[in-house]
Amino acid sequence: MSKLKEISRQSTTSWSPIAQYPDYMAVGTVTGTIGADFDTSSKLEIYSLDITNESKQMTLKGSTSSSTRFNKVVWGQASSNFQNGIIAGAMDNGTINLWDPTKILASDATDGGGSDDQSSLIGVGQRHSGPVQSIDFNVQNPNLLASGGSDSEVFIWDLSDPTQPSALNPGSKSQQSSDITCVAWNKKVAHILGSASYNGYIVIWDLKSKKTLMTINDRNRKCKYRSIVWHPSEATQIVAASEDDDHPVIQAWDLRNTTSPVKSMEGHKKGVWGLSWCPSDNALLLSTGKDNKTFCWNFDRQEILCEINDNNSRNNINNNSNNSNSDNNNGNTDPNAWNFEVQWSPRVPALLSTSSYVGKVNVYSLQDVNEKSTSGSSAGQLNALGIQEQTSQITPTIKHTPNWLLRPCGAAFGFGGKIAVFGRNKKVTAAANGATSPSSSSSPASSVQQSQLQQQQRVIHISHVTTEVDIVKSSEQLENVIHTGQYEQYCQEKIDQSTSDEEKSIWGFLKVKFAKDDRLKILDYLGYDIETIKKELKQFLGTLPELPIESGFNELPIENVDDQSKPEPTTTTTNETVHLEPVVDENNNVVDADSFFDTAASDANKEQQDDSSSSPSTKSPTTTTTPIEFPGDEKEQMITKALLVGDHNSAVECCLRLGRYSDALILAHAAGQELWKKTQEAYFEIVRSPFGRVVSCIVKRDFQLLVKSADLKDWKASLAILCTYAPPTDFKILSGILGDRLDKEASDLKSAILCYICAGDIDKTVDIWSRVSQQHQQQQRQSLTSSGNSITVLEQESNKDLQNLIEKVSIFRSACNGNSNNNTLNQVLSMKYAKYAEILASQGNLSASLRYLAPITNSQCKQEYGVLFDRVYRATSNHQGIPQPPFPFQLVDVYSSNQPIQQQQQQQQNKAQQVGHQHQHQHQHQNQHQHQHQHQHQHQPPQQQQQQQQQQQMGRQNTFNQPPQPMGQHQHQQQQQQQQPPIMMNQSPMQNNNNNRIPMMNQPPMMNQPPMMNQPPMMNQPPQMMNQPPQMMNQPPPQMMNQPPPQMMNNNQPPIMMRPMQPSGPSPMNPPPTMNNTQPPPMMNTMGGPSSVNNSQPPIIPMNGNPLPMNPMSPMMSDKSNQPPMNPMMNPMNPMNPMMNPIQPTAPPPMNPMIPQGGSPMINHPPPPMNPMINNGPVSTPPMNPMMNQVVPQNISPPQMPTRSPVLENKSSSPSSESFTSPAPKPNVHNKTPSIITGQLGVTTPSEGPSNEDTERFVEKLQRSIQELNGRTDSKVWEDANKRCQGLINKVSKKDISAEAFKALDAILASIVEKDFKKASDTYIQITSTPLWGEVGSQSMVGLKRLIDLGLKSH
C-alpha cells in the first residue's frame, strides 16, 4: 500500500469511466476556498496518473477555464455522440455546465494554465436558484443527470441534446425541505433516486410515478446527512454519512424496514463528509471526515480495515484501526486540513483518491507498487544526544483480500477424466430471507448472524470431461466387439472404412484368421481365386489341340464324396489347409495328389504280380487294330533291348540322356520305388527352368528352400504355395521366414506385415506397425511445422495412430488366442498398452484401462506405470477378476520428531515380539495379580512396558511409588536429580504404601533365612551405587574400577552380606520358599540357546561388595513348571551378567546425568535414587534384569573369583541352538564414539551387517524366486507374499538387520532357490524361536513363510 501521485490543487475530482483513459481524472477548482496567492480563478483540468513518469505530480493532459467554481464534478459514461463521455459540473452559481473531454484533451496544456477557449463547453443548464451541491449520472441511462441544490430542489436533466439540456422535477417538493447535500442513483433500478438533506432526511424518489417513494430519518439521532451511496448489488440498501460532529456515524438503511438502520459504523471522531463504494468489491467502503481521517471499511463485518493518510512517508495506509481513537493528525499541522472527498477508480480497482483543503489531491494504491525496501527507514527527530534517529516503517496489510485478487472461478483436472469447477455465487443476505428486526443493528449476535448470512457460498461441481471423444468411442466399440465376439463383422467395417489398399489388406488378413477355411481366404486376398483360375484354365485348354485319346481328362468320373468320408491327406488335415478336389482312380478310390508319385511304383509292382499270377486264359481277350511292332530306330532299339533283358536302370538312363524325360519317368515308375526317386531327382537336376524349380519344391516338399531362395517380387506366389501345400505347423514358421526376408532384404514393410499375420507373430507385427507409425508421425510433424499448425494436432494424430494400433493388436491377439506364446507382451507392446491405458484412464474409462494394464509383464514398463496400475485398480470397482497389483510405494513407519531413535527401534522390536513371543508372556499374565510388586516390569502390558523403556532411555530415576513423568519434563527431571539427596538402601523406598516388601537391587541373598520384611534403618551403611556417572560415557573408567575390592582377593573369605533385622510384627505376606544349594533356581533363558554355568564357579560379588539378590520372593524359584525359559544373562548368579562382573565395566547409557557437572565420577559419590540400568539397545523380550542387555563377551572370566557357589544349571534349551546363535544387541546409536573400554579388554563387537554384494545377491535371488512362484497356485497368497517380501527387500537393501539375521535369511533363501522347500520350512521354524524373528519383523518373516507354502503346494 502506498501513495502514488498527487496534484497540487484544491479541487473536487472525478475518475474517468472511459476504457481508453482508465487513469485519467477530471479536476475542478472547489468553491469556498482560496489559495495562498489569493487566486480566485476556476479551472477544469484533466490529469493522467502516468506511472511511467517518476515525478510525484500527475501529468496534466488538458485544461479549460470556468467562470465560476465547482461544488461537484462528475465524468459520465460514453455515448454514441460522445465517445469520451461528458464532464458535468455542479457550479456555485446554480448552473449545470457540460464539457466535452475530447476537446479539453485536444487543448494546449504545455504551459500548465487553462485555456480561455470555451469551445469545450457544450451546454449550460439553469434551474436552481442557489448553488448546486451535488450531481450524479444515471448508471444505466447516461443521458439522465440528477442534481440537488441549496434551494432544496431536485431536478432530473435530460442530456439527449447536451447543448440544450432540459430539466424536470421528480415529484412534489418534500415537506421536510432543506438544503440538498447529495443525490445518488440506484445502481440496480434505473428509475429510483435518493437525495439527502441537511436536516437529516433521506428521500427516495420514484421517477415512474413521479412522486416520493419514502422518507428515511433516524428518530434517535439528529444526523445531518452529507453523503449517500447505494449498495452496488443490493437494490434496497442505501448508506448515509452524517456530518454532525455529535453523531459522526455511517448508517446503512434497508428500504424494506426503515424503522432503524440495519448497520451503524462508528469510527470517526467528527462529522463524515464523503463516502465511496468500491465498484470491484462490495465489501470495501471508503469514508472521510472532518477528523482528518480516511477509513477503508469492511462493510459486511462493519470493521475498519485500514486508515489512509498523507504523512509524506512511504506507507500511507495504516492498518491499525486503533489509530481512530488517537487525537493526532497524522503529520498534518492544520487540524482543519481534512479530506472532504474520497473516490474509488471505476476502472482500476486498487486506485483511490482523496481531496483535502490543504490544496492536494492524493492518489493511493491498496497494493504496494514502490520498489523501495519494506524495512526502509525514514529520518526521525534528534534525540537528547543530538543524534538523528531513524524510524522504520512497517508495511501494513489489510486483513481482507479484495475481490479483484480472488479467482472468481477455477478448475482442476482430476484422475479418471474428472474436473472440479468452483465459483462464487450470489450472496445470501438477510434481506433475501425476510425483513430485519429493528433491534438487529444494536445486537452483536445479530450482527454476526448478518455477517454469516452474507458470506459468499462457494460450490464445487465435479464433472466428467472427455477430451478424446473419437478415442473413447472407438475404445467402447472395441470393448463391445471383444465382449460379444463379433470379430469378422468388426473387421469388415474396418475394411469398408479404410481408404488405402494397405489397410484393407491388413484388416482382410485379420478377418480371415477367424474363418474356418482361412488359408483359402488368404489365397483369395493374394489374388488366386480358385474359381477364377479354373475358368482361365478351361479357356486355355480350349486353345490347345485335342489329345489323340478316346476319353479326355475331363471325362474321368469323379464322385462327390462327403467331407467326413474323405481320407485326410497331409495337406488337408486341418481347417487351415486348402481343400483340393479329390482325385479318383478307376476303382473309385480317392488318390492323394501329394503321395501319387510315391505310390505309383508300388502300384505298378503290384499289377505286375497280379498279371503274372493270373493265367492267360483268365484274362479277357483284347481287340487290337494295329499290330505291335518293335522299334527299328537304333536308339529305341537299345532302350528296347535293355527292357527285354530287364535292365530298367540302363533304359531309364538312356531315356534321360536322349532327352526323353517322360519315357524315363514312366519306365522308372514301372521299375520300382528306388528307381523312381532317383529318376525324379535326376529330372529336377537336369530341368533348371523356373517351372521345374517350383515343381521340385512342391514334389520334394522343400518349402523352406522355396521361401529362402524365391524372388521377393513373387512373395505372393510363394505364400500361395505355402497356403496350398504346407502343413499347419510349417506354414506359420515359413510365413515368418518369408516376412523376415521382406522386412530386412526388401524393406517391404507392408508385405512383411501380411506374412507375419499369417504366421501369427504378434511381436514382429507390432514392431513393424510401430515403425510405420513413427514414420507417419515424423511426416506429420514436418508438415505441421512447415504449415505452422499447433503441436496439439500432432498429439491428436499420434493418439489416433495408437488407437488404430491397439485395435489391430487386440483383434490379432483374439485370433491367435490358441497360441500360448501370445500371452506375454514384449517391451514395445507393453509400452503401447500402458500408454493407451493412460489415455483411457485420463478419459474416465477405468475398466478398459485396467484390462490393458493387467497383461503387462515387462519389468521396466511395470516400474514406470506401477503407480498408474495401482491407482486405476483402486479407482474402479470392476476388477474383472484381475488380482490387485503390488503397492508401488515403500511403507515407512512415521514417528514423532522428538522420539529417540532407540525408542523407535524398541517399538519395532516390541511389535514383532508380541507376534513371535506371545506364548512367553501368557504364564506371566496369569500370575500378575499375585506378584505385581515383585515382577511389575514383567507383567505390565506392552504400553506400560514401552513407557518404562522410554523413561529408562531418557535417563529418569523414578522411585517405586512415584508415577512416571511425561517426556517433556525430561530436562527438568535431570535438574531435580542433580539436587536430590542420596537414598540409602534402608530408607523408605524399601516399603510401599501397603507395607509390602519390594526387593532391592543390591540386597544380599539370604540362604535358609526368613525374608526381610520391615527392616529398620541400617546405620553406618555406605550408599550403594546403582549406576555409573555420565562422565564415564565415552571415557575409560578409573583404574580402580578394573580391580576387585579387597574382600574379593581372598578366596577363603566368605562374601559380605547384610544381616537382616527381625521384623517387628507379623508379615503381611506368606514367606516365600527359601533357597538352598540342593535346589537352585531355574536359569532364565529367552535367547534361544543353551546356557550353563560351571559348578565350581563361586558367587560373584559386585563392585559395591554385596552379592546381587537371587530374589527369594520370586515365584520363579518355587514354581518351575509354569515358567517359560529364561535368559542366563538375567540370572544374578551368572558370571556373564554385567552387574556380577567387576572386571567388565560397561559404558553407561546416554542422557543419564547422575551427578552435577564437575562432580567426581568415583564410586564414593552419593548415588541417585534407585533405577534399573538403562537399556542401550533393542531387546527381543522384556528384560527381567535391567543389566541383561549389556554387551559382554562370553569368553572372558573375571579373575580371582570365590570358590563357593551354589550349583546353577540351565533347565531349558532351544533346538535353534544347533543352527543359529542369538545375536548380540545392536550398539547404542547415540554413542558416536567407539567404546574405549571394549577395545582395551579385547571385546569383539558384533558385525555391522552384510556387504553390498551380499545384499544385492540376496535381493536378486529373492525377486527371482517370487517371480518363479507367480501363477502356480493361489494368486492371492502370492500377492500377499510379494507385498510382505518387499519390506524384507527394503530392510536388506538398507542393511537394517544384523549379519546373523542375514545369514539365517540367506539359508532359507538358498533352500527356496534350490526348490528344497522342506528344508526351507525347517530352517524357518528354527528362526521363529530366536530373537531373529523380532529383528527381521513379523511382516517379512510371514512373507517368506508364504513363499515356502507356495513352493510346497506347487511341488
Swiss-Prot record:
Belongs to the WD repeat SEC31 family. It comes from the Eukaryota. Residues 567-577, 612-627, 899-917, 939-953, 967-1034, 1205-1223 have a biased composition (Low complexity). It is found in: Cytoplasmic vesicle, COPII-coated vesicle membrane; Endoplasmic reticulum membrane. Keywords: Cytoplasmic vesicle, Endoplasmic reticulum, ER-Golgi transport, Membrane, Protein transport, Repeat, Transport, WD repeat. One of its GO terms (molecular function) is structural molecule activity. WD repeats lie at residues 5-48, 65-109, 127-167, 175-215, 220-263, 267-307, 334-374, 412-463. Residues 1230-1252 have a biased composition (Polar residues). Coiled coil: none annotated. GO terms for cellular component: COPII vesicle coat; endoplasmic reticulum exit site; endoplasmic reticulum membrane. It is a peripheral membrane protein. Residues 108-127, 311-338, 558-585, 602-632, 898-1035, 1190-1255 are annotated as: Disordered. Pfam families: TPR_Sec16, WD40. GO terms for biological process: COPII-coated vesicle cargo loading; endoplasmic reticulum organization; endoplasmic reticulum to Golgi vesicle-mediated transport; intracellular protein transport. PANTHER family: SEC31-RELATED PROTEIN (PTHR13923), SECRETORY 31, ISOFORM D (PTHR13923:SF11). This is Protein transport protein SEC31. SMART domains: WD40. InterPro entries: Sec16_Sec23-bd, SEC31-like, WD40/YVTN_repeat-like_dom_sf, WD40_repeat_CS, WD40_repeat_dom_sf, WD40_rpt. Residues 918-938 have a biased composition (Basic residues). It comes from Dictyostelium discoideum. Component of the coat protein complex II (COPII) which promotes the formation of transport vesicles from the endoplasmic reticulum (ER). The coat has two main functions, the physical deformation of the endoplasmic reticulum membrane into vesicles and the selection of cargo molecules. The COPII coat is composed of at least 5 proteins: the sec23/24 complex, the sec13/31 complex, and the protein sar1A or sar1B. sec13 and sec31 make a 2:2 tetramer that forms the edge element of the COPII outer coat. The tetramer self-assembles in multiple copies to form the complete polyhedral cage. Interacts (via WD 8) with sec13.
